[in-house]
Every structure is written in structure tokens, then in C-alpha cells.
């Protein structure tokens, strides 16, 4: 069975495979010559990107009937990798693990080519809890740093702001953007660059390709089509830079095709992209909560609750209230509001309103961006601090 570890660049896939897993195997008694490690991103291994060369090399390393562990990093750099992996599957004494940084070429293939013979393990940047295990300051200072520079493991090795900023900017430009341009042969890259800026400036905002195309036309004087914008967004999603969250009609029990919300999988990369401007903590916290829920394995949608209100003329009108997150994992479901501050009765009423219109028995929560005790009001709505949510594994059950 093929085990595929997917996730964004520099989130720790290689370290997991080549260091932690290799150490585990050796400590379990596996001989080092039965662990075949190939890093396809390493220039000295460029010849291995040819399927014939790679297959021949692995075949030459297998000299007995004992089990061999084949570990391949950045497998999407291998031409015709599906054929090669299928070849390894036919060997009776191999156990294959690969990593990859492009969902289009990996997740889809696992679901089709390797159905029943492979599974995907999604890897994310460090959670805040993991981040704090290596951070020496207070949770409050740690959260500020985490929201500013993100959770890529390497960021913790830099001691100065300048080094952190340079690392993130260089990673975005020289790795992510270059990879997308090269992989999809994008020559007119100005629109792609501008699209990334727009999405980074509007995290958590509802939008769609048609709306974005109109923005390009009116503000950027660009004739880019909505189909091209959709392709570019797909490329960004496939590279694990952003994720799309779909709206769900809670009462109608159906998905709404458009518009969508887009969240950056690492806030540090998002912030570096826009030169650490537009640092509204309301939006950063919403993105942070989304990421934490995804790390915990939840499917996360945007909730829509249709309501009827009375306008100033006394007439009924239809409108919609929004639940920030509907989180589903197996039989579990939670409705969650993100509120950086609730300093007035009006703000409390505003955050509660969508949750009160949800008439099922699943748990309803407000996550507050400051320290506060866990409370449950007369409507059954739990309020919890962002620190408890991020640092306690059982936070959703409090």
C-alpha cells in the first residue's frame, strides 16, 4: 500500500519521513540498508526524476527477500510517478512512503489510480500547541508571534524579525510562486501576482471568480477571464497555499455553489506577501481558527441561516445570517463564531444571533480573542477563549 504525505512546502514532510520515521524504523530493528531514501528535490538526485533511472536504482538496492522501506520526497517531481509507484506495489517485499506538495497530482491519483492500495496523510504547519512546545515566552506573546510569522517549523530557528521576514518572503517568491509559474507554464504572471494580493488582503471575505474578474476589469484594467481566475485559484489550492471553504444552507441542508471564502494555510506567508500590512486581528483570528480546525481533522464550511426580518417600512424581507464555521468530523458537528472582542451588548447579540437560529442539538460556541473563563449562557451557547481553544485538545467539549 502506498502512503502519501501531502502538504505545503516546508511544513515538515521531509523531516517526518527522513528523520523521525527513519529513526523509528532503525529503533525498531530495521537495518539501514533496508531503508531506501530518495530526495527528488535535491539537485544531485536530478537523474532520479527519470522513472527508468529511479526504478532501476531501487531495484538494484533490493538484494534479499526481507522487507524494504522506500521513502521518496517530493514525488511529483518524478515523471510518470504513477507507473513507478505501481511497479513498486508489485514487488512483494516493499513498503512505500512518499511526500508531495501538489494536491492536483497526488490526492486525485490516490483516489483513482491507487484506490484501495493507498491512502493520504495531510500535513499542516505547526499547530499553536506544537508551536508553544518550542517557544520560550508566554502564550500571549507566542500567539502574537504565531499570528504574525505563522507556524512553519523553520521560523522558530530564526531569532530576529529581519531573518523571519526574509525567510517567509523568499519562500513565497522563490518556491511557491516560481513553482506555480513553472508547473503551469504561466508567462503573463502579473495577474496571478495581483490575484494573490487580493486574496491575501481579503482573507475570510466572500468572493468568486466572476466578482474577482470584475475587480480586475474595473480597478486593474485587466481583461483576465473568470475561467483563468478559477484556474489560478485552483493552482493556489493545489499548492496548499490556500483552502476554499464552501457555504452551507443549514436549514435547507444543501451547499451553495458560490461565493466562497479563502483562507491561507500559513498566516506568516500571507502576511509576508502583503508586507505585513492589513494586520486586522479580527481576520487573522478567523483564519487561525479555520486552520486549527483543519489540523484537527474537521471539514469546515461557512454556515448560512435564512431569516425573515422587518425593515423600516414594516415590511418583511428575507436576509441571511452567517455562522463563521460549521465543523464536521464523523458524527460530530460544531457551530462556531469567531469574535476578537465582545465589548458591548450589541456585539454579544450580533454574535449570538446566527447560533440562536440554528435549531438542532449540536454544540454552539463563540471563541473570544482574549482570556476569559469558559461559560455557557441560558441558550446553551459556550464562550471560550482563543487560548483554551488552541491549547486544550478537548476544548470543543468544555
Task: Kindly give the residue locations of the regions a language model identified.
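Conserved P-loop NTPase "ATPase switch" module shared by AAA+ and STAND
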Residues: 63-81
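Conserved glycine(s) of the Walker
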Residues: 12
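Short glycine-rich substrate-engagement loop in P-loop NTPases that contacts/grips substrate
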Residues: 36-65
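Structural recognition of the conserved hydrophobic beta-strand(s) that form the central parallel beta-sheet
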Residues: 95-101, 122
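Interdomain hinge/linker elements that couple catalytic modules in large macromolecular machines
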Residues: 124, 129-306, 318
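Conserved ATPase-coupling elements of RecA-like P-loop NTPase cores
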Residues: 47-50, 76-85, 108-110
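Short regulatory helix/loop adjacent to the ATP-binding pocket of P-loop NTPases
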Residues: 87, 104-119, 134-136
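A cross-kingdom feature that marks ATP-driven nucleic-acid transaction machinery
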Residues: 1, 6, 15-16, 22-23, ...
Amino acid at each position: 500500500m502506498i502512503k502519501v504525505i501531502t502538504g505545503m512546502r516546508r511544513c515538515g514532510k521531509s523531516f517526518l519521513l527522513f528523520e523521525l520515521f527513519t529513526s523509528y524504523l532503525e529503533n525498531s530493528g530495521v537495518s539501514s540498508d533496508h531503508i531506501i531514501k530518495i530526495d527528488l528535490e535535491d539537485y544531485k538526485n536530478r537523474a532520479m526524476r527519470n522513472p527508468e533511472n529511479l526504478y532501476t536504482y531501487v531495484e538494484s538496492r533490493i538484494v534479499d527477500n526481507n522487507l524494504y522501506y522506500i521513502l521518496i520526497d517530493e514525488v511529483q517531481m518524478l515523471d510518470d510517478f504513477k507507473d513507478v509507484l505501481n511497479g513498486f506495489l508489485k514487488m512483494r517485499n516493499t513498503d512505500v512512503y512518499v511526500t508531495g506538495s501538489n494536491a492536483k497530482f497526488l490526492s486525485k491519483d490516490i483516489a483513482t489510480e491507487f484506490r484501495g492500495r493507498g491512502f493520504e496523510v495531510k500535513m499542516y504547519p505547526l499547530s499553536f500547541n506544537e508551536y508553544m512546545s518550542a517557544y520560550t515566552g508566554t502564550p500571549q506573546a507566542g500567539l502574537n508571534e504565531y499570528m504574525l510569522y505563522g507556524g512553519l517549523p523553520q521560523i522558530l530557528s530564526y531569532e530576529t524579525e529581519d531573518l523571519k521576514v526574509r525567510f517567509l518572503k523568499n519562500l513565497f517568491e522563490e518556491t511557491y510562486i516560481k513553482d506555480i509559474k513553472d508547473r503551469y507554464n504561466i508567462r503573463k504572471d502579473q495577474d496571478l501576482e495581483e490575484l494573490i494580493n487580493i486574496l491575501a488582503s481579503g482573507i475570510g471575505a466572500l468572493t468568486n471568480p466572476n466578482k474577482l474578474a470584475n475587480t480586475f476589469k474595473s480597478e486593474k484594467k485587466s481583461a483576465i477571464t473568470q475561467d483563468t481566475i478559477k484556474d489560478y485559484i485552483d493552482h493556489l489550492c493545489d499548492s496548499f497555499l490556500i483552502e476554499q471553504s464552501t457555504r452551507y444552507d443549514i436549514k435547507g441542508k444543501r451547499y451553495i455553489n458560490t461565493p466562497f471564502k479563502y483562507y491561507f494555510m500559513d498566516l506568516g506567508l500571507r502576511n509576508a506577501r502583503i508586507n505585513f500590512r492589513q494586520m486586522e486581528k479580527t481576520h487573522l483570528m478567523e483564519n487561525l481558527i479555520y486552520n486549527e480546525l483543519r489540523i484537527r481533522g474537521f471539514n469546515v464550511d461557512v454556515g448560512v441561516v435564512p431569516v425573515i426580518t422587518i425593515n423600516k417600512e414594516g415590511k418583511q424581507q428575507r436576509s441571511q445570517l452567517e455562522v463563521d464555521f460549521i465543523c464536521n468530523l464523523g458524527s460530530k458537528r460544531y457551530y462556531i463564531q469567531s469574535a476578537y472582542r465582545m465589548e458591548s451588548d450589541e456585539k454579544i447579540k450580533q454574535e449570538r444571533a446566527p447560533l440562536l437560529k440554528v435549531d438542532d442539538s449540536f454544540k454552539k460556541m463563540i471563541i473570544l480573542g482574549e482570556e476569559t473563563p469558559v461559560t455557557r449562557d441560558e441558550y446553551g451557547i459556550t464562550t471560550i477563549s482563543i487560548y483554551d481553544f488552541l491549547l486544550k485538545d478537548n476544548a470543543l467539549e468544555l
